[in-house]
Curated annotation (Swiss-Prot):
Its main location: cytoplasm. It comes from Escherichia coli O6:H1 (strain CFT073 / ATCC 700928 / UPEC). It catalyses: L-arginine + H2O = L-citrulline + NH4(+). One of its GO terms (cellular component) is cytoplasm. Belongs to the arginine deiminase family. GO terms for biological process: arginine catabolic process to ornithine; arginine deiminase pathway. This is Arginine deiminase. Gene3D superfamilies: Arginine deiminase (1.10.3930.10), L-arginine/glycine Amidinotransferase, Chain A (3.75.10.10). It comes from the Bacteria. Pathway: Amino-acid degradation; L-arginine degradation via ADI pathway; carbamoyl phosphate from L-arginine: step 1/2. It is an enzyme of class 3 (hydrolase). InterPro entries: Arg_deiminase.
Length: 407
């Protein structure tokens, strides 16, 4: 049965979401490779998995459908065309050489689809291939080198694709460590029975090509509703990527305006949702740095000729108020004194997942910010995050809404 896929806001009733439980990819993280793979530290994968199960069950207890990326990928591999496409794109002749690549693809094609999905996200080392596969490429590599690097950032399903009103952007990622993630999502959205033939728009990123500087990540995209989309211009999401997405949204009449805000280019502000999330009709959780009056902000609208009209805004808050038709945005800033606020922002106090207006999921460790939410009438459903939080992503980062009501 074809499911409905539509995301009309950040705060309407959440109905269906895609998550990725920690698996082999995080077990491949070591102190020597974690920074290359965009992590600050190694995690206890078993404990992270337990915490993730609590997160998923919290959503299920609220009546929200939870789909797991590994399950979707495994089921997608049941489609012969999808399996062939994924093996061709993820095991490249140009990376491994035509003979070795063919041998590896042939061997992978014979394993169970669950095991193949595990390797497509968790990576593959030279030590794992059969001894019968012999090649100069094998002879010149250490057994612990990667044939296919792991994708530990699949944990953050928010970034690789984002649903915006009646369509999806399958995002070209900025960092090499994440670019192969997008191919797994391309395959799921093309061939999985849940999505294949669905009446939704693919705005951007569905082609497996070099997007150069036109990169986009879902953590920077907030569907604030009423025909508006708010996008952070970060170290991962570029003006070029924003323009491509905005033009597609306007072409398909799915948005009336796109608000673009420039973010500080440092690790703690990696994406807009690490410093700002929409949690109630007129209420945003923010780390104050992003709403300073001197932050650059523009509103993009259609120019009537297929291009974009750009309007400089006086402040981000004013742009949001105009878009939502409200008199004043209410802000809940990160809690505690200056030291506590910086610590809690680093631990994703602002990166909460709104389930419905005024109800969010967030890490229990952020006690000062959670107390401010409570005093403001926002209900926090707390989840543990001592290990998950070390990946530098909270409940919003770890979730990709597939169906959410508008406002």
């Amino acid at each position: 049965m074809m499911e409905k896929h539509y995301v009309g806001s950040e705060i309407g009733q959440l109905r269906s979401v895609m998550l990725h439980r920690p698996n082999l990819s995080l077990k491949r993280l070591t102190p020597s490779n974690c920074q290359e793979l965009l992590f600050d530290d190694v995690l206890s994968v078993e404990r992270a998995g337990e915490e993730h199960d609590i997160f998923a069950n919290t959503l299920r207890q609220q009546g929200i459908e939870v789909l797991l990326l590994t399950d979707l990928l495994t089921q997608t591999l049941d489609i012969p065309e999808a399996k062939s496409w994924l093996l061709e794109t993820q095991i490249s002749d140009y990376r491994l050489g035509p003979t070795f690549a063919t041998d590896v693809r042939t061997w992978l094609a014979e394993m169970s689809h669950r095991d193949l999905a595990r390797h497509l996200s968790g990576g593959l080392t030279y030590s794992e291939i059969p001894a019968s596969i012999k090649n100069m490429v094998v002879d010149t590599h250490d057994i612990n080198d990667f044939i296919m690097k792991p994708l530990p950032n699949h944990l953050f399903t928010r970034d690789t694709s984002c649903w915006i009103y009646n369509g999806v952007s399958i995002n070209p990622m900025a960092k090499p460590a994440r670019q192969r993630e997008t191919n797994n999502l391309r395959a799921i959205y093309r061939w999985h029975p849940q999505f294949a033939g669905g009446e939704f728009i693919k705005y951007f990123g569905d082609e497996n090509i070099n997007y150069d500087h036109a990169t986009l990540e879902g953590g920077d995209v907030l569907v604030i509703g009423r025909g508006a989309v708010l996008i952070g211009m970060s170290e991962r999401t570029t003006p070029q990527g924003i323009e491509f997405l905005a033009q597609a949204l306007f072409k398909h009449r799915q948005a009336e305006r796109v608000i673009a805000v420039e973010l500080p280019k440092h690790r703690s502000c990696m994406h807009l949702d690490t410093v700002m999330t929409h949690i109630d009709i007129d209420t945003f959780s923010v780390y104050p740095e992003v709403v300073r009056p001197d932050v650059n902000c523009w509103t993009l609208t259609p120019d009537g000729h297929g291009g974009l009209k750009r309007t400089q805004e006086s402040t981000l808050l004013h742009a949001i108020e105009k878009a939502l038709g409200i008199d004043q945005v209410r802000l809940i800033t990160t809690g505690g004194d200056a030291f506590e606020a910086e610590r809690e922002q680093w631990n994703d106090a602002n990166n909460v997942l709104t389930l419905r207006p005024g109800v969010v999921v967030g890490y229990e460790r952020n006690i000062w910010t959670n107390e401010k939410y409570d005093k403001a009438g926002i209900t926090v459903l707390p989840i543990p995050g001592d290990e998950l939080g070390r990946g530098r992503g909270g409940a919003r980062c770890m979730s990709c809404p597939l169906h959410r009501d508008g406002i």
